[in-house]
Amino acid sequence: RYGSSAASDVYKRQIIDIELLVEKELGEFAIQICDPQRIGTFIPTHSPFKRWEFEIHDDDDIDEFSSDENIKKLLSPWLNPDEYKILRKAIYQFHSVLANEFQKDNCYLIGDAAHQNPPFMGEGMMTGCRDAENLSWKIIMDHKYNLGESLLKNYQIERRDHARFIVENSLGIGLLMEAYAHTENIEDVPAE
């Protein structure tokens, strides 16, 4: 029942993730597309593969939105349909959630059970791996040397602040992208 101790989910967005086979050179930099009509991301994974993500609006019909015809429209500013092959498409929901407690008695939360964040820092999976690494050696040492709870109690102290940093900053980057996409004057976007 740890879910009930989680902080509120202040950032919920759906995106479509589209993986393509593209022979055309598109550069080696990830690009955030701050288009007021539809925010998106371009990620140049290992050649010849490319990844595009586009925000799904609340009033979009998911089936229609994820159709190949609509994907062609989404990609049309950058690619012609004969320049790519769609390999995969998936709908994801991004969250910004941080559990208030990562441990209680002998129950521990790691990874997505403890924290979820938008992907804008690219740290979601690695934050979960750091949780697992931090907790696993403590459990092994406790089991091997019967150290009691003292070592295991440090898990919350050592991991929650780091996870909070990732969640809050990922959220901040997402909100900043939205602010840039929806402003007429860049100087109107707050510095923080």
Where are these regions (language model features)?
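Structural preference for long, well-ordered alpha-helical segments in enzyme cores
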Residues: 1, 71, 135-136
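Single conserved hydrophobic/aromatic residue that forms the stacking wall/gate
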Residues: 1-11
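Short, polar/flexible loop-turn hinges at active-site or ligand-entry regions and domain interfaces
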Residues: 4, 22, 26, 59-62, ...
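Short Gly/Pro-enriched turn/cap motifs at secondary-structure boundaries
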Residues: 8, 30-33, 99
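Flavin-dependent oxidoreductases
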Residues: 14-41
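Conserved FAD/dinucleotide-binding core of flavoprotein oxidoreductases
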Residues: 35-91, 188
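Conserved mid-domain beta->alpha element of the FAD-binding
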Residues: 86, 92-172, 179
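Long, low-complexity segments enriched in small/aliphatic residues
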Residues: 186-192
